Amino acid sequence: MKSAKKLLSVLCLGIFILTFTACDMVEKTPEAKAKSTIAKVNGEKIQRKDLDESPSMQQVLSQIKTQYGEEFEKSEQGKEVIKEQKKQILENLITEKVLLQKGKELKVIPKDEELNKEADKKVNEIKAVYNNDEKKFEETLKSTGFTKETLKEYLRDQIVIEKVINEVTKDVKVEDKDAQKYYNENQSMFTEKPNTMNVSHILVKTEDEAKKVKKRLDAKEDFAKVAKEVSQDPGSKDKGGLLGDISYSDSNYDPTFMKAAIALKEGTISNPVHTQWGYHIIKVNSKKEYPVKKFDSVKEDIKKQLKQEKQQEAYTKKIEEWKKASKIKTYEKNLL
């Protein structure tokens, strides 16, 4: 099972790894179900087997079996969960089909010899994950529903998709001034060591409650005592509201909460801060802040990051445009 997961994670790693003739109701055989049409994209069919055999679907089924057991997918709840997952994966397969069609239109598909060479290189990279153990590699292929031939065909498609994406994003550029602006606005991200702060908070439901809490704290009542009395955060209430050390870049906290906390000076308490959880009174107990790296030492990293973001935006905009212009029809009744 671990080997299978390893291969699936390799195949599903890239940002753009996306992986039924309509049947009459009387067709109940596995073969007929596999060939049933689940979508048409500009006249080209996507069959149920394309979805069921995709790495994404295999990974979903593996996770479901690990989490809920072998029988879960046969239950009504399991079928509903799987159907929702299939709908998401089908959307990816439709995107993949549009990209492959555009590959022909844009004339970016390499000749077979070159395409096979690139696919073989990727196969060898996957084999390297298994220390080039051919037996283990073949066993894993079998357990994930691949043969050497179908794996290579899958990789050929992914190579074409990469080339389409490269064509769409080839003109994206980032200037030094863009990097400088980002650096100036986000200097806490470029310190010699990550900046951290030790934070406590009191969480209440309403703004009026928060104002009353702030008034008590302004009157010099003990923060921890008030937190234990009124805070509605079960994770920190009994600790006097203490959240502990938090990195300035920690994405586990609400962005509004983080912005307010970072803006506070050491030892100070905020006014009420509204987030999705309610109203917070935040106290920064201490801070550890480090010198900011020189712009020239981080410029290229910033430009690389900004370029990737712009490429993603350009790709997303283009694929939405292409899909909107395509004739797409789905047949959700054939998903199960």
From Swiss-Prot:
GO terms for molecular function: peptidyl-prolyl cis-trans isomerase activity. The keyword Signal applies. It holds the Pfam family Rotamase_2. One of its GO terms (biological process) is protein folding. A lipid is attached at C23 (S-diacylglycerol cysteine). It comes from the Bacteria. InterPro entries: Foldase_PrsA (IPR023059), PPIase_dom_sf (IPR046357), PPIase_PpiC (IPR000297), PPIase_PpiC_CS (IPR023058), PrsA_foldase (IPR050245), Trigger_fact/SurA_dom_sf (IPR027304). SUPFAM superfamilies: FKBP-like (SSF54534), Triger factor/SurA peptide-binding domain-like (SSF109998). It is a lipid-anchor. A lipid is attached at C23 (N-palmitoyl cysteine). The keyword Transferase does not apply. GO terms for cellular component: plasma membrane. It is found in: Cell membrane. Keywords: Cell membrane, Isomerase, Lipoprotein, Membrane, Palmitate, Rotamase, Signal. It catalyses: [protein]-peptidylproline (omega=180) = [protein]-peptidylproline (omega=0). Residues 1-22 form the signal peptide. Its EC number is 5.2.1.8. Its main location: membrane. Residues 194-286 form the PpiC domain. Plays a major role in protein secretion by helping the post-translocational extracellular folding of several secreted proteins. PANTHER family: FOLDASE PROTEIN PRSA (PTHR47245:SF1), PEPTIDYLPROLYL ISOMERASE (PTHR47245). Belongs to the PrsA family. This is Foldase protein PrsA. It comes from Clostridium botulinum (strain Hall / ATCC 3502 / NCTC 13319 / Type A).
